[in-house]
Amino acid sequence: MNALLTPDYGLIFWTIVNFLLLVFLLGKFAWKPIIGALEARENKISQDKKDAQEARDEAQKIKAELDVRLSNISKEAQEKLAQVEALAKQQKDAMIKDAQASSERMIATAKEEIEAQKNQALKEVKKEIADMAVEAAAKIAGVKTDPKTDAALVDNIVKDIINKA
């Protein structure tokens, strides 16, 4: 027990020499590679942080561009929708105008046809009246007339009737 508590100066000397030799050798051969590896790792971490920040900045820039594009697309869509609505309204108005014009033409055509049929009916009635008047006059007179005379007489009677109407 005494031997453990008593220092051996030779052992202390060689322990110190070994320690200093170990420190020297580690400093000469191992310390630089360890420090180099630590610095390389620190540089890599620093570079990764820079790259991550650049990527984050780029992502924010792209997001901002996409937001602008989305806004522009939304505006364009609204403009297109407004144009389509305006075009649809124009087409609707044009169709209504065409339908009105068509109905007015149909009404005018129908009125013209009615007027033509009325005039034709009046002519036929007047001709029949004139024929009946000629026949009645011929019966009263008891005279047989030729067709030329009948036609001239009918024309005169028709003219008289037309002038009176």
Curated annotation (Swiss-Prot):
Entry GO CC: plasma membrane; proton-transporting ATP synthase complex
Keyword Ubl conjugation: no
Keyword Cell membrane listed: yes
Transmembrane segments: 11-31
Compartment(s) where it occurs, according to its Swiss-Prot or TrEMBL record: Cell membrane
Domain of life: Bacteria
Pfam family, one: ATP-synt_B
Bilayer topology annotation: Single-pass membrane protein
Family: Belongs to the ATPase B chain family.
Its biological purpose: F(1)F(0) ATP synthase produces ATP from ADP in the presence of a proton or sodium gradient. F-type ATPases consist of two structural domains, F(1) containing the extramembraneous catalytic core and F(0) containing the membrane proton channel, linked together by a central stalk and a peripheral stalk. During catalysis, ATP synthesis in the catalytic domain of F(1) is coupled via a rotary mechanism of the central stalk subunits to proton translocation. Component of the F(0) channel, it forms part of the peripheral stalk, linking F(1) to F(0).
Name of the protein in its database record: ATP synthase subunit b
Source species taxonomy: Bacteria, Pseudomonadati, Elusimicrobiota, Elusimicrobia, Elusimicrobiales
